[in-house]
Amino acid sequence: MTVTLTFWGTRGSIPVSGPATARTGGSTPCLTLEAAGAPLTILDAGTGIRALGASIGNRPLTGGQLLISHTHWDHIQGLPFFTPLWHQGTSLTIVGPRPEHASLASVLERQMEADVFPVPFAQFAEPPRVREATAEPFDLPGYSVRPFRLNHPGVTFGYRMERPGMGAFAYVTDNELGPGHHFTTSWRDGLGDWLSGAQTIVHDSMYLDSGLPQRRGWGHSTASEAVNLAADAGAVRLVLFHHDPERGDDAVDAMLASARELAARRAPGLEVLSAHDGLVLHL
């Protein structure tokens, strides 16, 4: 049974616009999984979620589920502009890790306090239900989910998702693969085990190899690191994601070409794509 994966936002850190980024797009992270018999499942609530809401229109969203990887701005800043939440009859459950210094619900609510936003969280027509997840596996309607703690400042989860008839899918945003932050070699081994056998991996490719030494510990990876990880995991498809806001379309094309050259040497069967706003894949 086909599962449709749609990319609504693929930039990291801050949304961008203009002719230099028109093909890749400039919205921050938001993806959806759609499958017959399963509720709409959303991954992250960056500014891309606004376009998702516009596609739903004035209809309420019933039984929707939103997985938050972490609460940095670029992954939650679109939530106030998700129009279904302003329509009666919408039901949305938000699931994500507990941040280090507050509850998940309080962080989502605080970004809509009066000092920074005109309308409070409580005034959504149908305020979402918020549930905190641990790193233990759990089930959502339609999917089995295995979280994994990523190498990124704060508490950040990647999600491996499976369902009958769908190749295992892994969403690995905001993740530093090289040395940095506070994780060890055993963490990297665990990441490889967690990804093993995943058919499609969406992975952070924020930085270029040339600029990485100055950004160690910031919690992001390069396309070449992502290719090597996907090759080691035996993946069929790698989607490069979380593009640097300073990277124009031509630079994204060059990054992709270099990544494909590396993949041809490391894992000839690995398909490498670069995410762009509006990309649709089938799992």
PLM regions: where:
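Binuclear metal-dependent hydrolase catalytic cores
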Residues: M1-A170, G178-H181, G192-D193, V252-L283
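Conserved SAM/AdoMet-binding glycine-rich loop
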Residues: T173
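Cap/insert and terminal regions of metallo-dependent hydrolase folds
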Residues: A168, E176-E271, H276
